[in-house]
Amino acid sequence: MRCLTKTRSFHYVIIFYSFFFLPFLSSSSDDQRTTVSGLFCGGRSKSSADPNYIPTFVEDMHSLSLKLTTRRFATESLNSTTSIYALIQCHDDLSPSDCQLCYAIARTRIPRCLPSSSARIFLDGCFLRYETYEFYDESVSDASDSFSCSNDTVLDPRFGFQVSETAARVAVRKGGFGVAGENGVHALAQCWESLGKEDCRVCLEKAVKEVKRCVSRREGRAMNTGCYLRYSDHKFYNGDGHHKFHVLFNKGVIVAIVLTTSAFVMLILLATYVIMTKVSKTKQEKRNLGLVSRKFNNSKTKFKYETLEKATDYFSHKKMLGQGGNGTVFLGILPNGKNVAVKRLVFNTRDWVEEFFNEVNLISGIQHKNLVKLLGCSIEGPESLLVYEYVPNKSLDQFLFDESQSKVLNWSQRLNIILGTAEGLAYLHGGSPVRIIHRDIKTSNVLLDDQLNPKIADFGLARCFGLDKTHLSTGIAGTLGYMAPEYVVRGQLTEKADVYSFGVLVLEIACGTRINAFVPETGHLLQRVWNLYTLNRLVEALDPCLKDEFLQVQGSEAEACKVLRVGLLCTQASPSLRPSMEEVIRMLTERDYPIPSPTSPPFLRVSSLTTDLEGSSTISHSTNSTTTFNTMVKTDQASYTSSESSTTRTI
C-alpha cells in the first residue's frame, strides 16, 4: 500500500506538470522538427524504486544539456547507488540552437515515463533515451523498434520507398547521416554516433523495410534502437542536409525560456516526489508503531534492542539458527547467561503488523510443554524482534530428511514426537484460554529440545477461533501439501485443517519421506500409503531405517502400522470424518480405543486406487465420501510436484 501511494503521488505530480506547463512549452515548439513522433516507456526495475533514482535522472539530463552546447551527440552515465545511462542524438542538419530546442522539448516530455526504468523519445529532429544499463552500441531490437505512417494516401504504391533507400545508403557512406530528394519526395536517415558503420547499415536496412510498409502514404517514419528514417512529400530538413551555424535571436530566446522552464519544472517534480515519499513513509511507520503500542504493552516482556543486539553479536552470521519467509532467527546469550532465540522480522507493512500480533498476542498468554514459549519482544529499535526460548536441536525436518542424521530418530522417539505434537495441537484447539488454529503445521515448524521432545513453533499464520463459530472464512495461507482440501477450495477454516496437516506430518515421520517427493511408480507419499493400505501391506510404507529396530522390538511394527492408519484417518477428504486431536491422542495411547477404517484421501481419483504396486492384481475399493469431493476438487497429482514445500499467503 505504501509503494502504491508513492506511485500515485508521483503520477499526480506528472499530471499537474503536464496540464499546467506543457501548453506553454508547446507554444514555443511550432517548428515541426520538435514534433514528437514516438514515446516508448519501459518496465520498472528494483533500481527505479530507489529514492535516489529521480535525483540521478535529473542530474543526467542536466549533464546532457551542457554537452550539447558544442556537439549534436552526447552520452552520460552516473554510477552511484542507482546507475542511469542516457543518450541524446540531434540530426546533423540541425543548428546548435535547433538541437538545444529539440532536446529541451524531449527533456520535458520523457518524464512522463517516470518512474519506469527505461524510456525512448523520438522527435523529428532528435532522439533521447535513458536506461539502467549501458546500451550505446545497440542498433536494433525486435521488441522495441517501431514505425508509423501518416493517414494521407497517394497514388504511387512505391511512394517514398526508393528515396528512403537512397538516403540510407548515403548515411552509411557518409558517417551516419544522409538526405535525398527526387520526384517531390524527400527522406532523411540518421544513425547514432555511438554505432559503427556496419551496425548503422544493419539498422537502416531494417528501417527501410519498415517504412516500406507505409505504401501509398504521404509520410513514413522508422524509429529503431540505433537509427531514425523519415520520408515525406515535402522537404522537412534544412538546406541540402548541412547544418546552419547562424542563430536567430528569437530562437535563442525560446531556447533559453524552454531550458529554464524545464529545469524549474524538474526541480518542482523532484521536491514534490521526495516530500510525498517521506510523508507517506512517516505516516505508515507511525501507524504501525501505534498499533503495536496499543496491542502490546506488557513491560515485563519488553527487551531493549541494544540488549538483543549485543546478545546476538550484532546479528552475526555465525549466530544464525535458521531463516524463514518472515524473518531470520539468531542464537542470543542474555547478560544473565541464558540462551534465547531472537527472531529478526523483515516486514514493515500491514501484513507484518498482523503476523507480529499473532506471534505476540496469541501465544504470549499460553504455555504448554509442546509449544515454543515466547519470552518477549522489542519494538523500539530500527526493526522488530521476537524473543523465544532456545530449542537446541533445531527443527524436525533436519532429523528426518538429512541423510547424515536420518538414523538418529528411532521409532520410540518418533512416536514421542507424534504424540507430543498431537498434545500441543489439542491444547491449542480446546485447552488454551482461546481456540487457536495454527494453519502451518509441518516438519520445519516442529522444533526438538535437548531430549528430542517436540515444540510447535511459528504462529505467524495462526487464527483465533470463537467458541460460537463453526468455521472461519479467510484467505488461503499455509504450505502446499499440508493444507486441507476444503480450506484450499472454499477458504473454510476449522480445527480439522490442522488435523489434516498433522496427518501429513504423521506420514512423513513414520515413512521418512517428504509429502511432496514424487516417485513415478508409486506417486506421492499420501497416494503410496493409501494404496499399500488397500493392499493390506501398510508395513512396506514405513521408513526402511527402522527395519532392524522392528525386528528386535516385538510389536513395534504393528504399532507403527497403527500410527499410519491414524495418519490416514486425519487426511481423509471429508473434514467431518477426521478425528479431533483429543481423539487422536486416545487412539495413540489407549490400546482398546477403536480406530475406524479410513476413507481415501483427497486429490486421488478412484481409478488411481486400482494400481497394484507389483502389477499383479487389481484392487476395487469403494468410498463413501470421496466421489462427491472429487467432483469438486479437480486437482491431480501435480498438486504435490514441487521439489520443496512452498508457503502460500493470500491474506
Curated annotation (Swiss-Prot):
Protein kinase domain: residues covered: 315-604
Active site residues of this protein: 440
Catalytic activity of the protein: L-seryl-[protein] + ATP = O-phospho-L-seryl-[protein] + ADP + H(+); L-threonyl-[protein] + ATP = O-phospho-L-threonyl-[protein] + ADP + H(+)
Record-listed Phosphothreonine modification sites: 474, 479
UniProt key word tRNA-binding: no
SUPFAM superfamilies in the cross-refs: Protein kinase-like (PK-like)
Residues modified to Phosphoserine: 444, 473
UniProt protein name: Cysteine-rich receptor-like protein kinase 42
